[in-house]
Amino acid sequence: DDLGIRLYRVPVYWDRVEKTQGEFDWTEYDWIVKQSEQKNIELVFALGYRVPRWPECHSPGWVDALSEEEKQRAILNLLKSSVDHFKSSPAIIRWQVENEPFLAVFGECPPLDENFYRQEIDLVRSLDARPIQVTESGELSAWLNGAAVADILGVSMYRTVYNPFIGYTQYPLSGKFYRRKAQYIRNLVDDVIISELQAEPWGPDVYQENGDD
């Protein structure tokens, strides 16, 4: 209320909502949705295995014992259960499926299976008519992969970053860099937005788990 922000992206963390396989607890997110509805706040729900916050992939412990095929079925079940539970809320304006799925150089995640990712997109589309948001790195991607499957393309914008090998570095990129990339793929999507905007440089502790707080 103090900040006056009226649009939030909400990551749904798998390890919080399905601690036991097949048993979902939506209590935390039901509260967020209810508060948003009461305050006329719009939400983008980020769903899937890989969602914002280091280490990006947040799976419950029981997933470790699954085969790859079983794991994919569990992810699809997570998506279906999430959309079915929340799609009645008018506060949610679109679904984000995974987070920067084509970015292989950040996060502790397995390699992307592009065919399976398209299955995820298709499943969410079949469950609800809201737009699908796909996110890409603003600096480390041409945005074409995300634009090919998205309704809304969200891009990150970082200026000063930390690398454990070379320390701090700054991207020598102007606003024209992002604008031209957006113009290049504009006909492929309904809109291009900034989904992450850096507020301050990250430091070495970005590679550590920060906990629930």
Locations of regions flagged by a protein language model:
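Short, acidic/polar
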Residues: D1-D2, I75-V83, E136-G146, D212-D213
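Aromatic-lined substrate-binding rim segments of carbohydrate-active enzymes
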Residues: D1-G61, C109-Q133, A148, Y171-L173
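A structural motif corresponding to the C-terminal end of an alpha-helix
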Residues: L3, Q35-E42, S81-I93, E120-R130, ...
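Glycoside hydrolase catalytic-domain groove-lining segments
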Residues: E114, Q119, S126-V206
